[in-house]
Amino acid sequence: MYSANGHFKKHWQNYVKTWFNQPARKTRRRIARQKKAVKISPRPTAGTLRPIVHGQTLKYNMKVRSGRGFSLEELKAAGIPKKLAPTIGIAVDHRRRNRSLEGLQTNVQRLEDLQGQLVVFPRRASRSRLVILPPRNCLTATQVHGAYMPIEREKHQLILSKVLKKMKSFNAYAKLRVERTNERHIGARMKRAAEAEKEEKK
């Protein structure tokens, strides 16, 4: 329903949202980024290293993205103590669980690659077990700007072929639904089959 008249609250002018501060806010954010980059130098501007994870839900689980932090299992497999990891630029998420071997191996390899490239300027050289450079080298070290060790997504190659009758009759969505239902009921069906077998033996 449309009305030609303006249906406003009383004193509505006092509650109008304005965006006059937007350009200044943009400038403030940029200056803050620059100050932070100087403060954390020679550490990378992108911050800590994040793991490669799959998105949640059926819609996004085929896509990989950066996660919150490496799991304790991944750190252990890579031989990095969990207390040391945050001090050398590795994000840690103690709540994350590894649900697949492939995911675990991918992130362990990522940590090992980082260890191969990592250079540490420790406060106390005697306590570090990693590659150490003298403090004077810290002044000449260059800072990495932007993403480092970026996630490389696989590009699937398309193969063209003729559309066959079998392809037209195949209902992909229905097939996926059936397989998902089978997966959900597998436990109950196995239990029922075991009970039926037990009854037959009697």
From Swiss-Prot:
Keyword match RNA-binding: no
GO annotation terms (biological process): translation
InterPro entries: Ribosomal_eL13, Ribosomal_eL13_CS
Top-rank taxon, per record: Eukaryota
Keywords: Ribonucleoprotein, Ribosomal protein
Pfam families the record matches: Ribosomal_L13e
GO molecular function, one term: structural constituent of ribosome
The keyword Plastid belongs to this UniProt entry's keyword annotation: no
Record Gene3D superfamilies: 1.20.5.110
Protein family membership: Belongs to the eukaryotic ribosomal protein eL13 family.
Protein name in UniProt: Large ribosomal subunit protein eL13
